[in-house]
Each structure stands twice: as structure tokens, then as C-alpha cells.
Amino acid sequence: RYIRRQRQMCIRDSYETGPGKDRRFDLEPSHQPGAPRIRRLNSPVDHHREYWDFASEGPFVEIAEDLLGPDVKFHHSKLNFKWGDGGEEVKWHQDIQFWPHTNYEVLTLGVYLDDVDPTMAPMGIIPGSHNGPLFDLYDESDTWTGNISENDLTLLELDSAEYLSGPAGTVTVHNCRCVHGSAPNLSSRSRPLFLCAYSAAHALPITDLTRGGKYSETIVRGKAARWAKFDSRPVLLPPDWSKTRHKSIFEHQQNEN
């Protein structure tokens, strides 16, 4: 039921974009209302109650509790469309540098809304990379790129990547330190993936990127933490988004204005 309803909303959202800038949506440069090229619906839980019902009461919460412990917070959500016939790549990156926390007990759960096969550019994960280094996502000119540099990629075993395909309803899980990405979608079919990030209650956000969200930092299982937990490993800080407008990962990685 959840997947069927989310897929219906996904199709509707793809035709709701018109002229002008709507910050709910991240659009490919070639997007037209009659020929939509949507990269992402930002924070779908803020716009459709069904998404929040799934994120706060559905199987994601059970999985998050199993992996993070009894006290779980919701952080943010997004719906990546990965449009067919060339939907843009997502270069290799780690998530936590975009929204650092006091520790690394933060993960992202995803669910495919359509069947996804290997030709549709499924998300790829480098196994074990969550135990490796945290990479710098700035370039040599100190510009935030949102992706791991070519030099640093030589430190990774990219050939070991596991690409997560499966039928509609397949769930993906990756820790906030996992190196992941996806190729351009050269198939004729879109590959919508609904993603929700959760943290242990004791992992506190250091930056305020998602604090404007209606449900950001909502306890979805257990209770709020009385003590924060700090990891001894450092975390990279992103630019001050309050002074420099935050662009989507696609805009950063493709160096779009």
C-alpha cells in the first residue's frame, strides 16, 4: 500500500512543475513542464502526509531501531527521480560532510518505488568504506564540490562497488560514512528512490541545514537523549549555508550556478 501510494504521488509530482523556481524541486537544466526532467523532490515528508506516515510509522523505523538502538530521530527526506534517458550521475561522495553530527550513528534508508535493474544506474556502495577515511569534499581552491576528488578516488577500491538493484519495495541502507554514488541513467525508465535519514537520539546535528524541515529532529522511536555522544574522529564542516545559499548535491557536483 505504501509503495503504491508513493508511486502515484511520484508521478503526480513530476507534472506539477511549471515556469519559475520552486525550491521543492531540483530540476535538470533541460527540464520543461511538458517534458519533465526532475532530479529531486526536496523533503517530500513536508509536502505529502503519506510520505511522513511511511517515514515515521513504516518499516524504515523498525530497521533504524535495529541498527541505531532504541532511541531514533528522523533527520530529513528526499525523493531522487533519476530520470530515464540520461538522468544525471551522482559522483562518489559521503553524506555526513553535508550535515555533520556529533557522531556517526547516522544512516540513510531508501526504497525503490519501481523495479530497478542494473541498466537503470542503481546506487552503488563501496563495502567497508564506512570504516575508512572521511574525505575532503572541497577542491584545491577551497570550493565545495560535494564529491570525492579524483586523487582521493585512487585510495578506494571502486571495482568492489555493489550496485543495489531489485524490485519495487527493495530497501537500501547505508551509513553516513559510506562512499556511494550512481552513474547516469541511460535506460528509458526512471528510477525513483525515496530516501530518509535517521540518527541515534544522542547524535546531534552540528549545522542547521535541515532545521527548517517540519519534522527534522523528531523522535520516531524511543525518547529524546539527555546526553550527547561525541565521536573522537573529526568531521569535515561544509560551508556556512546561512551565508552561502545551499544548492543541491547535483548543482554542486555539476558546478551549476
Predicted features, each with a name:
Residues 67, 93, 100-118, 165-167, ...:
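Short, conserved beta-strand element in jelly-roll/cupin
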Residues 20-29, 76-85:
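Short, glycine/charge-rich beta-strand/loop segments that flank catalytic centers
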Residues 1-11:
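Single conserved hydrophobic/aromatic residue that forms the stacking wall/gate
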Residues 78, 83, 94, 111-115, ...:
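Short, structured patches in soluble enzyme cores that scaffold and shape functional sites
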Residues 17-26, 171, 177-257:
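Non-heme Fe(II)/2-oxoglutarate
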Residues 116-183:
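Double-stranded beta-helix
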Residues 81-95, 176-181:
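Conserved short histidine dyad/triad with adjacent acidic residue
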Residues 33-77, 100, 113:
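Signature of the catalytic double-stranded beta-helix
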